[in-house]
Curated annotation (Swiss-Prot):
GO terms for cellular component: extracellular region. This is Conotoxin CaHr91. Disulfide bonds join 45-60, 52-65, 59-74. The presence of a 'disulfide through disulfide knot' structurally defines this protein as a knottin. It comes from Conus capitaneus. Expressed by the venom duct. Belongs to the conotoxin O1 superfamily. It holds the Pfam family Conotoxin. The keyword Metal-binding does not apply.
Amino acid sequence: MKLTCALIITVLFLSITADDSRGKQGYRALKSIAGMLNSKTVRECREQSQGCTNTSPPCCSGLRCSGQSQGGVCISN
């Protein structure tokens, strides 16, 4: 009888704690990857001395991309 009661209490405790943790800790790696991707797309233009290519965001105003074909750099006009 004591074992049955202890088992029921344990199952109830585990079911209560399982509901509390739901959705708080899932897929941390995916969240961090999504955060990194979003941080790269927020930037609208490349600053001076940053790399630039045909597919990257354009250089900021007053700058131009020098040497795009070989992995260019944003420099002053």
